[in-house]
Amino acid sequence: MNNTMLEPSPATLDPHLLLPENYKLLLENDLVRVFDVRIRPGEKLRLHANGPSVIYVLNDGRLQHTYEDGTTKVKTAISGAVVWDEAEAHETTNVGDTDIHSIKIELKTT
């Protein structure tokens, strides 16, 4: 196992700093940052970047990611699902009619 430390999200794109009303920090240590993430219906989160993450989805919903190159991807969140999310910069919009609520575990090591 490679324990090389990765840099956390660049400060300028760190969702915890940019979006404190959406990303509540629950835990941080040398290995991970754990967030309670909430996005209201129709809400658009500005460009931000997460490290590689595991997401535990707490309720159903639909969201759209818009990437720096302009491409978009609509994703369906299913309550109880556990999802791997690669490190990348994106905007997120809740395109559904329910709150998006998840726990995001952002890895600091590989």
Which ranges hold each PLM region?
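A short glycine-rich, His/Asp/Glu-containing loop-to-beta-strand
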Residues: H16-R46, G51-I55, K104-I105
